[in-house]
């Protein structure tokens, strides 16, 4: 092979590049995002040591954003230096029109119902959940559902028993989520960035962009 043939061979474009130049509309210009995943044991450790780092507020913000993804999107954040406070709730729903709720695609979206949420990092989760439910009900605002989210592990039988007791006592449905629920939902690919954005896990997330097509 002489030099001219070799130079011609080297200069020839790849078939994909040639076709892309001729028919760009037939090729995707989307980007694929690769990011490192969060280790479950590391995230579990961070949930367990939130109080040591005074990250109660960051955890509350994270839980609200996670609940917006997994339970209902129309949650309003509480204001003030420490959320909750006189409002008795850490977050609650705000009313929206049925047209907006329809486009959410959720079967149980509270369009006009009032749902209240309590978030806790306390070790005595049972006392805290009971106190939160009583405080929320004392407002007389007509809440029809209460969610308590704890950063602690809770035995299933104990959680179910307290849910039933509180629901029966106050006449509304009470749901309690613990650390297992938080871990399972957070580690889903669609939710991992929430923990990173809220500065919960002390890790560096490496991003890599790749052109698809």
Question: Language-model features: where?
Answer:
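Mixed-charge (Asp/Glu-Lys/Arg
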Residues: 1-213
């Amino acid at each position: 092979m002489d030099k001219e043939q070799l130079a011609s061979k080297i200069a020839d474009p790849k078939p994909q590049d040639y076709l892309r130049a001729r028919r760009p509309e037939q090729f995707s210009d989307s980007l694929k995002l690769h990011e490192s995943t969060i280790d479950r044991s590391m995230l579990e450790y961070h949930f367990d040591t939130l109080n040591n780092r005074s990250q109660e507020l960051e955890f509350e913000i994270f839980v609200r954003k996670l609940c917006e993804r997994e339970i209902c999107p129309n949650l309003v954040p509480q204001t003030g230096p420490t959320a909750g406070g006189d409002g008795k709730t850490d977050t609650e729903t705000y009313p929206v029109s049925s047209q907006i709720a329809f486009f959410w695609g959720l079967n149980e979206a509270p369009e006009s119902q009032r749902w209240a949420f309590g978030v806790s990092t306390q070790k005595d989760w049972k006392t805290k959940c009971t106190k939160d439910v009583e405080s929320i009900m004392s407002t007389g605002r007509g809440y029809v559902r209460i969610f308590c989210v704890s950063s602690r592990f809770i035995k299933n039988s104990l959680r179910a028993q307290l849910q039933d007791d509180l629901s029966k006592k106050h006449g509304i449905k009470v749901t309690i989520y613990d650390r297992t629920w938080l871990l399972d939902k957070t580690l889903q690919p669609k939710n991992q960035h929430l923990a990173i954005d809220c500065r919960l896990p002390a890790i560096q997330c490496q991003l890599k962009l790749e052109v698809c097509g």
